[in-house]
């Protein structure tokens, strides 16, 4: 069933509550990456243009004690948002109370107000994170309709997403709509053939995703640290490479039942120490020295993976191929990025997290159909789990 989106709502003159994802990195009170603010702009601008009175909610970081508040205020976000919109954004340094209620009452059509960090409510019995029913009801009482545009927290049942949705007509913002379309599309109705590329350090992080994707993907290419548990399951010697002993049986069973679908590295870049300056050797996957660790897939693996990608109509990628933060071990990730970017007739999706950071930092941002804004949310969505934040959005 299709979900309501913001353009389905009548917004003129209404107080529109919106859950955005402004969980941006800060250093000394300055925003170091404003990507999440930029991604939120289309929905915000649409609500303003339609004459809505916009009240924005977001969390920022984890608030565990009173002293955390100072470094986790949303004031820098209000300033950045004001600059990007070219208009004043009223910032209310509270999450409830008369000051907030009065500021909302004084809003005119097209005005924007940002409420303080929703997780300040976690200091009193984790009211935000545990979806306290009274808090959700109170926040909902401040507005007429609700727009959820925070995919990054869609896998969480919090007062500021699910709690508010319980009491108000709820629609997805444009960013949330894109995530439902692309990540949801991979899971529910992909254009075949589908190739999934999985990387990153741990098999344990991706077990649910693998179990779901074997029913969807024609091929699953596995790189990154997680590949070595699979190679060990095949009986290969992996030296000091990353290994999850307790996942060998899972890998073995998967290779036995779905071996035709799974493609593993054929070579690797190995080193004696975990450092960018380490001496690098390229070896066949059968020749990893006992005193060395695989830090990246090798050129033959990039070639093999590129070949497997040819002809794919849908590609979903989650997790880098090696220690891409070290430039000497980024070639595998760059190679896969290039191979995906060169596909002509494919829908190409990065499922958030480290692979999204890698693609953006390596300059491939514009070469993908969609780069997800969610880390944990993307993974759970790819597992086929119905996310609470999406479930709470009204159907059309």
Curated annotation (Swiss-Prot):
> What biological processes does GO assign it?
gluconeogenesis; glycolytic process
Question: What is catalyzed by this enzyme?
Answer: (2R)-3-phosphoglycerate + ATP = (2R)-3-phospho-glyceroyl phosphate + ADP
Please report the organism this UniProt entry assigns to the protein.
Staphylococcus haemolyticus (strain JCSC1435)
* Keywords tagged on the record: ATP-binding, Cytoplasm, Glycolysis, Kinase, Nucleotide-binding, Transferase
Q: What is this protein called?
A: Phosphoglycerate kinase
Q: Where does ATP bind?
A: 206, 325, 352-355
Q: Does the keyword Transmembrane helix apply?
A: no
Q: Does the keyword ATP-binding apply?
A: yes
Task: Supply one GO molecular-function term.
Answer: ATP binding
Name the family the entry cites: Belongs to the phosphoglycerate kinase family.
List GO terms (cellular component aspect): cytosol
């Amino acid at each position: 069933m299709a979900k309501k989106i913001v353009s389905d709502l009548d917004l003129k003159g209404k107080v529109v509550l919106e859950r955005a994802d402004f969980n941006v990195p800060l250093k000394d009170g300055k925003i170091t990456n404003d990507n999440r603010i930029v991604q939120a702009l289309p929905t915000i601008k649409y609500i303003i243009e339609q004459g809505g009175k916009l009240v924005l909610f977001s969390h920022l970081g984890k608030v565990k004690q009173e002293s955390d508040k100072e470094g986790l205020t949303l004031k820098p976000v209000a300033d950045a948002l004001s600059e990007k919109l070219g208009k004043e954004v009223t910032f209310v340094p509270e999450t409830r109370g008369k000051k907030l209620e009065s500021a909302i009452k004084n809003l005119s059509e097209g005005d924007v107000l940002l409420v303080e960090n929703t997780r300040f409510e976690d200091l009193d019995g984790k009211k935000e994170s545990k979806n306290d029913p009274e808090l959700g009801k109170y926040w909902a009482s401040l507005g007429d309709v609700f727009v959820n545009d925070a995919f990054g927290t869609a896998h969480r049942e919090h007062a500021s997403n699910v709690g508010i949705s319980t009491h108000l007509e709820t629609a997805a913002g444009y960013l949330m709509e894109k995530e439902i379309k692309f990540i949801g599309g991979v899971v529910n109705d992909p254009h075949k053939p589908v190739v999934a590329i999985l990387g990153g350090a741990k098999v344990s992080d991706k077990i649910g995703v693998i179990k779901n994707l074997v029913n969807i993907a024609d091929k699953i290419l596995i790189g990154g640290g997680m590949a070595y548990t699979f190679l060990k399951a095949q009986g290969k010697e992996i030296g000091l490479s990353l290994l999850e002993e307790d996942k060998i049986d899972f890998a073995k069973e998967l290779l036995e039942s779905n071996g035709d679908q799974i493609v593993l590295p054929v070579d690797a870049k190995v080193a004696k120490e975990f450092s960018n300056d380490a001496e690098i050797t390229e070896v066949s996957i059968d020749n990893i020295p006992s005193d060395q660790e695989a830090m990246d897939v090798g050129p033959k693996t990039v070639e093999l993976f590129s070949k497997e990608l040819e002809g794919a109509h849908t590609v979903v990628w989650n997790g880098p191929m090696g220690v891409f933060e070290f430039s000497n071990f980024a070639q595998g990730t760059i190679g896969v990025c290039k191979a995906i970017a060169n596909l002509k007739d494919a829908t190409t999706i990065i499922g958030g997290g480290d692979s999204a950071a890698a693609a953006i930092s390596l300059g491939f941002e514009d070469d993908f159909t969609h780069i997800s804004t969610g880390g944990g949310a993307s993974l759970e969505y790819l597992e086929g789990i119905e996310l609470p934040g999406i479930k709470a959005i009204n159907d059309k």
